[in-house]
Amino acid sequence: MLYEAYRQIHFKIIMDGSSSSITIVPLQYADIDECARITATAFSTDRHTIVKQLGEKPFNMFEVSRDGFRASLSKTTCVHVKAVNQKGHIVGHAGWGFRGIEENKIPWRHPDDEPPADQIRIIPEGRTHNESSNNKDQSSAAKETNEMGQIDHLHALEDADMVSTMNEIMPPGTSCMYITGLIVAPQYQSRGVGGALIEHGNSIADRLNIFTWVHSSDQAWRAYRKFGFEIFKELSLDLDKYAPSRPGKEWMTKLEGTGEGVTEEKWGSYVIRYMKRHPKFHDE
């Protein structure tokens, strides 16, 4: 029964000091670029992302997000939604992957539109970010660390940690959900949008009676904890060990007031938290 993705879900939130509402509906191909822009903007002040872009081969967050949507929007094991305000503007989006669940129980809906000609998939069909990481052999990942720059070592460290964690939390035979992304436009953060998206996913997990896990940024973990997620593993990173240069006045000024704690001399430490939520009324 495909229940959640076929109906509009309404949430009350606080907008500009007064009560307002958002509607959560399935993502369409026409929404991809806007959602990718929201992702890129949201991560533009994340010091972990900034440091990783200082390598010899910096990545473009807009392109990474856009390509991820293109690869997974038509997959029946991935559900993507958008949060829309009363003016029709997208204020956030979220996605969930499903493991070990019968496809007829996954609340997936084919997009109402078709991908434009310029949105040809450039990522092999059937591979999301999490799944492609899970398919990488750990020994191969270790070999790739030879003769790499510090940023490349950081990427390799995180990739290996992700593979190890995924093998631990969802070995063959596991039934679960995992959050592939949950982003709120910066100007709408701390107004209930993120909580509404988390609750939407939680309701799906509760109906299916499965656990959900997430690889959380240093900024988002408190929000997940508020909605029932608990930390089961952490990866602590000394960003100054990997950064090829100090933040300097430029980045210190740009990140002032963001809560990132960057100084002119130090990027600081950053903690990636793996978090898990059990469904309500589970028997464990």
What are these regions (language model features)?
Residues 46-67, 108, 113-123, 128:
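Conserved GNAT-fold acetyl-CoA-binding loop/helix
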Residues 184, 190-203, 226:
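Conserved acetyl-CoA-binding loop-helix of GNAT-fold acetyltransferases
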Residues 53-80, 85, 167-168:
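Active-site rim helix/loop that mediates acceptor-substrate recognition in acyltransferases
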